[in-house]
Regions:
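The feature captures the beta-strand-to-loop junction immediately N-terminal to the Walker
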Residues: 43-45
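Helix-to-loop junction immediately C-terminal to a conserved catalytic motif
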Residues: 58
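Conserved ABC transporter NBD signature motif
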Residues: 66-78
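Conserved ABC ATPase "signature" region
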Residues: 112-130, 182
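Conserved signature/switch motifs of ABC ATPase nucleotide-binding domains
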Residues: 133-136, 154
Length: 254
């Protein structure tokens, strides 16, 4: 097992609703360790705190109680070491595909001499022929692929994926799953993904963390002992699916 990269210690998060004079307890006393090279899938019903955990790790919000650390350094805000891909692609509409991908390198004055890295990312997602197009000319799936590699180009040690395939059709989702896995397996950084799709969680994850609500907490932490690429129809895959669906009270698939 690789060294611990990310640690959550006694993390709770509450949100105040001033207009209703009430407090929502989104997370309660979360303890969790994640290692370099892991692909963590967070699953659970709506309101169980999956996305709250991701936003805490990204540094977009702070815990009410507890602490989060990366390599023993406390998270106090956003950091390029933690790249995030949102559910809907956030691209600059006035920049071409090529310039969107290279934007962060340009901001760091690292673009010169790294043009080959941008070209490699374009090849990775199969959009070499669309590099001069603008986001408004792309399909939803193409735009999401651009958003993905824009986060990958800096090779962040931690990659955060907030249902980055949620708005895509089923066929495009499966292609995106394979593209994300290909990029992750090439770099073997820590990847953490929020999803409502149990099959997706098993197909991609080295661990599946099952959460429950009121307040959000970890119900189970399940290592997935399947080689890549994975077969959704295999007996072991179906066994994992039934186990997790049972924990989520959806019942096992027949």
């Amino acid at each position: 097992m690789e060294d611990v990269v990310l640690k959550l210690e006694g993390v709770s998060k509450s949100f105040a609703k001033v207009e209703k004079d009430e407090i929502t307890h989104a997370l309660g006393n979360i303890d969790l360790e994640m290692h370099s090279g892991e692909f963590i899938s967070l699953v659970g019903t709506s309101g169980c705190g999956k996305s709250t955990i991701l936003r805490l790790i990204a540094g977009l919000i702070t815990p009410t109680v507890g602490r989060l650390t990366v390599n023993d350094k406390e998270i106090t805000g956003p950091d390029p070491e933690r790249g995030m891909v949102f559910q809907r692609p956030t691209l600059f509409p006035w920049l071409t595909v090529e310039k969107n991908i290279g934007f962060s390198l340009k901001m760091k004055n690292h673009l010169k001499g790294n043009e080959d890295k941008v070209d490699r990312m374009l090849r990775l997602i199969g959009l070499e022929d669309f590099k001069d197009d603008y986001p408004g000319q792309l399909s939803g799936g193409m735009a999401q692929r651009v958003a993905l590699v824009r986060s990958l180009i800096n090779e962040p040690p931690i990659l955060l994926l907030d249902e980055p395939r949620g708005a895509l059709d089923a066929f495009t989702r499966m292609n995106m799953q394979d593209e994300i896995l290909s990029a992750w397996r090439e770099r073997r950084q820590l990847a953490i993904m929020v999803t409502h799709d149990v099959d997706e969680a098993i197909y991609m994850g080295t661990r599946v963390i099952v959460m429950e609500a009121n307040p959000g907490r970890i119900k189970a932490d399940i290592p997935i002992h399947l080689d890549y690429p994975r077969n959704r129809s295999s007996a072991q895959f179906v066994e994992y699916r039934n186990q997790i669906l049972g924990m989520l009270n959806y019942g096992a698939a027949e």
